[in-house]
Every structure is written in structure tokens, then in C-alpha cells.
Amino acid sequence: MALLVVAGCGADAEPAVPRAASTTATAPAAAASAGATASGDVTHSANVTHVANVPPQAPLDGPQAWGTDLAFQGDHAFVGNYDGFSVFDVSDPAKPTAVSRVLCPGEQNDISVSGDLLFLSVDSPREGPDCAAESGRNGGRGGWEGIRIFDIADKAHPRFVSAVRTDCGSHTHTLVPGKDGKKVYLYVSSPGPEPESTTCPAPHNKISVVEVPTADPAGAKVVSEPVLSEGDGEDGLGGCHDITAYPEKDLAAAACFGDGILMDISDRVHPKVLQHVRDEENFSIWHSATFNNDATKVVFGDELGGGVSATCDSGTPKNHGADAVYDLSEGRALRLRGYFKIPREQQPDENCVAHNGSLLPVPGKDIMVQSWYQGGVSILDFTDADNPREIGFFERGPVEGVGGSWSAYYYNGHIYSSDITKGLDVLRIDDPLTDPAKKVTIKELNAQTQVSYPR
């Protein structure tokens, strides 16, 4: 197969903050209340520092080469992109250095890592599974979308290993370690059906479970297709957008089309639905669940407008395009407690809505960081589930078209944000409330595969 890998680009040795299309537009009252300060063409709270930025570079710098999700392992960050993925050395977070950039088009290239393996989600028909395959749209043959698997033992030269086709492709996937230590499972989420498509037949009220033998990744295959709901959701759309697993607790929370779903994953191949929750008044597109450390709360997001609309402007209700905080009881039942939305009003042409985030490992507190597209990066304290509040933020000014932070995750003392058009941002929060998190070091992070930290 054709695989273009660009390794060790020295241009990243001295990353600089790029100029945005225009100046920031933070609501003055919100900025003042947060102790905001300006830094070049960005605005941030006084407790947040913009440490570094690595702008997009070839071959992942085309007009549709959008930055997407993130994963971490040791001193490396892995950044998905509509056109492939990048590997960065972040041993010095102030100077991220490119190790390799792999050209492998397939939107949206949602990414995860485990040991020497890297996984990518492809949710757009291709003429084949390899990286050289053309798009299957616009009259092409179509016929493949799903999961691509790479060997990353040599991070300067990632190697394509195999691929697995899944119905309706893979919009996102969640890595769940097998209990025998010899396999990992990927819970594959995607919307559907598409009646005219050869890759997404009706009905589509399910997910796909892909089993990957870690010693033989070429043997990866679909081992089950659990049905999570009866029929398709609203407007005939079924399936799930994404799933967050908490393997230690044998739990997963799925954000699906029409509802949130709590699952028992003690049997990795056959997850069992425990509860459906709906919010017909405030939620549109369920998205991005996050458990707290004790698994006594779950935060769901509402991606109203699909990430391309302005839902943080004055014309959108504060509980729309927001987060909802649920209690999770010992009996494993969800109960709605409160809502959160960033307090900084955005312009009517800035795409902004709740998106991907992760916990900060602060003992005794429930704190997470989250991306909000052009609304920036928000640090949220939801310890009081009835009254979640923002305690820090980072935000650029408006850009033309779709932009902003796709994913923002905390990893070993820093926040890493994948900006759709501006590249990789590294942030640091210095605050007595969050400083205990700096003492916690982990070896690997896939944000949708939660692990516990010391209480």
C-alpha cells in the first residue's frame, strides 16, 4: 500500500503561537469575572498559560485537513486529522516536536493507542481500506469504511497492519482492554442508516464490537453487533455517536441518537443495556460522556448543530448545546442534576458547542477540561452537580468558517488541545484547586477509556 510518512520535522523545534484571523471577542463581563488576560490574539483566564502551539504542516495542512482527536502514550501525543495523523514528542511540553506525520485520508480519523497499536476511525466510504484508496463518494465504487490498524513500535515510521469493515463505518471508537490481557476490543459507533449506501444498510440501531488480538492485529474482526435500542432514533437516524468506557467499573456510557445509554460491559463482547435516559426539552445530539473518578456522576454533552453551528450566541438558550450532569447511583441508575454552558457569549458566526473533554486527576474533586470549538477550552468544576462552574478557560478570536478546539484533554500536568485549523495547543493551569493533579502521572491516555486515579 502507499503510505506517506514525514518524519522528524525540525520546523517544530521552536513552536510559535500563530496569528488568528481576527482578534478575540470574549464577553467583557465573563472575562472580568474569570480574571481574564489577553495574550497576543488569544484570551485566557489568569490561571491558564498558553505554553506552545504547533501549526499544521505538510502533508496534513490542506484545506480539509482538520485536526480531530488526541491520544497519549509515554512522552508522545497522537493527533488525528481528516487526512491522517501526527505523532509528537511532548517530553518537553513547551517544545513539542514532530516525530512523524502520516498521510492517510479518511474522515474523521478518531484515534486511540494501546501498546504498539494505533487505531483510526473512518466514517466516509473509501474505495478500499488502505491509505492510498480514493474516496468512494461522487460516483466511486465505495464499499469500505471502518477501522484502520497501525503498528507504532517505531513511532517515526508507523506501519499499516490491517483494517476491519464495519456497518456505517466508524465515526468514533472506544478502546476497551480485554480481561485476559491478550486482546483489546473496539466499540465502534456510527450514525445510520443511509438507504442509498452500500456500506450503511437499515436498520442501524446497533454498535459493532471489533476484537483485536494484540499479538496478531491482522486477525482483528467484528465479533458482535449489539442492538442498543428498538428501531432507529429521531428522523430515522440510529446508532451512537460515541461511547465512554470505565473498564475498572465494568461500565460504559453511550451517547446515542435520541438518548444516553448506560451499559454493563463485564462481558466485553456482549455489553448489556442498563438504562436509557432522554432529555427532549434541552438535548439534541447526545455526545461525549465523562464519568467522575468514583463513577458516581456522568457528564453528557449536547452537540446541538453538529459542531458547525453557533449555539453559544445570545439567541440560543443556556441549556441548549450544553453539558448535563447526572448522578449515578449504587444501583447504577442515572438522575439529572444540573447543566453547564460556557459563560462567554460567542459571535453569531462562531461554531460553538460542548465537545470532547477529560477529567483532571484531582483527589476529592470532580473537575474536567473540555473543548467548545470556537468557544475554546473550558475547565469545569462539577463537584457540586447542581451548580457546575467554569474555573478557567482559553479562547482564540473568531476565525472564518469552522474552527476551534475539537478535543481538549489533561495529560501529565498539561492540557493538550487539537484545534481544527490552528494545530496542537499546549496549555497549563496553575490553580490551588487543580494543582494536586500535577502529582499524578499516567503511561497512556485514551480519554474515552477512563482509568481511576488515587483518591
Predicted regions mapped to residue ranges:
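Feature marking well-ordered beta-strand scaffolds used for ligand recognition
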Residues: L3-V5, C9-R455
